[in-house]
Amino acid sequence: MEGLVLLKALVTRLLFLLHSLVAVWRVTWVKEEHRYWLLALLNLLLVLETVLTLKFKRGRGYKWLSPAIFVYLVNIMPSLWLLEMHHGNQYCSTQSERMAQNFSRRGDVNQTLSSHRATNGMGNILELARGFVDNLSMVCEPVWTLGLHQTLLLILIIGRWLLPIGGTITRDQLSELLLMFVGTAADILEFTTETLKENNVRTNPTLVSGILVVWTWSMLQFPLDLAVQLKLVCPASVKARGFLRVFLCQYSADLWAIGLSFFIQDGPFLVVRLVLMIYFKVINHMLVFFAVKNSLVMALHFYRLVALIMATRDFMRDHPESPKPEHSGPDQPSESGPSEWEDASPEALPLRTSPVTSEESYPTTP
């Protein structure tokens, strides 16, 4: 079992490393400058994190945070920023046609030479691999960038699934977290694709940078597990300390989910879309639809917040704080009269005195 944990930890981090290297390779290909290979040095952080995790945690994760996912985002974010800031949309159709022509021409050549290389299996494999790499390099830039965005989100979900469970998270909580990640990834992907594909946006580097800042900010929720690990059972001592403590203790996970929607995802996304529509006059039916969707989600979260506040208020009203008993000091012994005995134990029966004669006290002997 320990070996399986170590294997899953290594395989997941290797997947992160390979994907970030592919992104760096694409940046160097687009920019045509080898100095961008220096971005690969960021992967040393992932190597360091792997060594520390294997040494101190035996491959298992941490509580409330996944350092591997955080370092992976640090590695790949600069490459995606450079690709998004590089303007190459106008060459997409030309490059796609050229790639299709080269692919068909190369396929005809391979069919002609296949009969002459029937016995050389390794040569065919190398030729196919070389042709595959050449075809990938000819794919137009927007398609490459979109593919990197899509694979990034898929690898985040699969990687979080494969990473060994650590801390206090359970399998049930992990499955709930992964389902949340799927919905979050879909929202983030449509935000980047729908906003950055507009020509009015692409021609404004400041606006592109602002959208990428919001996108980067929204990606920071993936390394956190607070939405499922903050489901606590409040002890009795907390329930006697006031409304705010009870509210924060009972609904900490719900409050974290509401905060994510307001300040990390739906709130910033709505602000960006409103700025595009009102200030920059970028209006289309998809942008309007997703703006309404973000508004509706935030309204529902606000409705839930009000419902949680009312539920806590009803709980405090039904469970009032009981008065604390007064403890007497060591030098002041407590004294109580008969009236206090009757109040303390109403079901107790009072003792009645009955006269006992001397004859009834002791049995007589014959």
From Swiss-Prot:
Q: Which residues carry a glycan?
A: 110
- Spell out the GO cellular component terms annotated for this protein, sorted alphabetically and separated by semicolons: membrane
Membrane topology field:
Multi-pass membrane protein
Q: Does the keyword Lipid metabolism apply?
A: no
Q: What's in the keyword line of the UniProt record?
A: Glycoprotein, Membrane, Transmembrane, Transmembrane helix
Q: Which organism is it from?
A: Mus musculus (Mouse)
**Ranges of Polar residues composition bias in the record:** 354-366
Chief location? membrane
Which parts of this chain are annotated as the region Disordered?
Answer: 319-366
Q: Where is the composition biased (Basic and acidic residues)?
A: 319-329
The UniProt transmembrane annotation reads 4-24, 36-56, 64-84, 138-158, 176-196, 208-228, 258-278, 282-302
In terms of Pfam families, this protein maps to: Tmem26
Nucleus as a keyword?
A: no
What protein is this chain from?
Transmembrane protein 26
The stretch of residues making up the signal peptide is: none
Q: Any idea where this protein resides?
A: Membrane
Say which domain of life the source belongs to: Eukaryota
